Amino acid sequence: MKLTVLSKEEIEKIHHTTLKVLNEIGVAVRNKHALELLKRHGFKLDGRGDVVRFPKEEIEKTINAFSNDIDIYDREGNLALKLGRNKVYFGPGGGAPNLLDLQGNRRPSTKEDVAKVAKICDALPNMDFVMSDITAQDQPLKVQDLHELEAMILNTSKPLVPVCLGNGHFADTVYRIHQAVHPGDAGVGKPFIILYFQPSSPLQLDKEPLSRLLKAVEFNIPLIISGAMTAGGTAPVTIAGALVTGNAEVLAAMTIARLVNEKARIIYGVGGVAMDLYTGNFCYGSPELGFLSGVAVGEIAEYYDFATWGRGACSDAKVLDAQFGSEVFMNAIIPALGGVNLIHDAGRIDFGKSGCLEALVLADEIIDACRRVIRGFKVDEEHLAFEAIKEIGVGGTFLSSRHTLKNYKEELWAPKLFTRLDFTAWINSDKKDIEQRAHDRVEKILKEHRPKEVDRDLQEEIHRIVMEGERAVLSAS
């Protein structure tokens, strides 16, 4: 099934307005190496020092350079994610400073908590890639990202998208870890780590993220380039205007990436949120998220033929209540029906300021239901079921028919966490609510699940690379 909200004419209006912004207003490029690269290729500055005009012809070269056909592997070297049209995958987010822990306390998160997130996601069937969800607040600020990466690698074999706080040193570390895990793969032919670049709205590409971008595309590491504009704050309050702002930032950054490596594996995103103008909070649970990070972004990316990154299955709720369930389903189904390839932030709560292990488990269940909706249903001879109707006839039951036995598992979604007991049966059972059942599932995974193990020598090598990366970052600061 597919959801659309924009006509081709509307997408073209967004595109042409984006071209006007890039050519007439420009984007600040606050990295001397990126500026020198642009100057060598004939780009003009507008007289303010670092604001670059991006002409239409160069943007068209960028659009034509990159493909939506990107393969991502797991740590073991197996194909895990095949990006392209209507390929939809989910994963958690990253960067939350707090954890709503298993005792119900909201506290600063730790490296050990990140390891638990990775282990939980490794066990959850609908978490297709892994981010840290939270941050290693017990590590030095400038190298928290390195420690989060180490914790994830050792606790899941799924593809990783680490949140990076630093500069090109992080890309160096990622490349070295890839070489340690897959010796001889100098060209990163089977990438299991995707790096992340985020502009600063409105219309700014900052020094450290650009250093990371330049290194990533040089090493041929897949790179997400995603805006993070806030409608009503760092971008126009109108959805179309916010999309134009984010699109301009992302196409400018993609153009810089192209000048380094025309065959770079770039994943396009806008990733915007709406601001609540009454509280000043950035809303992860708003219906507008479905446009700013979901279906509209998917349609624009399809117009360009780019692989896509978006946001969804997240909530502004503080606990696992009715608001959480409502917002997570709303913001999972919209980007998924829009064909966004990689949908992150699953299970995020509290405006993205907190993580919660039980929330990941509950989001996984909701995503599973969403996938049933996305899959739709078949209309063919077998599924029209004329012969079954004829066999059962008037007034019969299909409960025990061969047709039901053959097709029910494919047709009817069965929950793993939600209950379908009637009230009497529920009263006579353990009477646990959804939060308690999610808690039990977390406890069971942490106790029983065994991710594919990294052998001891490789663990030590990864730790050595991380510590060398830490020293490089701290000595440069």
Task: Indicate where each model-derived feature is located.
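Hydrophobic alpha-helical scaffolding
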Residues: 4-8, 24, 48-52, 107, ...
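Catalytic-core signal marking the mid-to-C-terminal active-site face
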Residues: 4-17, 25-37, 52, 358-477
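N-terminal glycine-rich anion-binding loops that anchor highly charged ligand groups
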Residues: 9-13, 26-40, 46-48, 82, ...
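Glycine-rich, N-terminal phosphate-binding loop and its surrounding beta-alpha-beta segment
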Residues: 36-105
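Short acidic (Asp/Glu) and glycine-rich catalytic loops that position anionic groups and cofactors
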Residues: 39-46, 230, 274-278, 308-312, ...
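Helix-rich catalytic cores of soluble enzyme domains
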Residues: 108-337, 341
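Hydrophobic alpha-helical bundle architecture
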Residues: 294-400
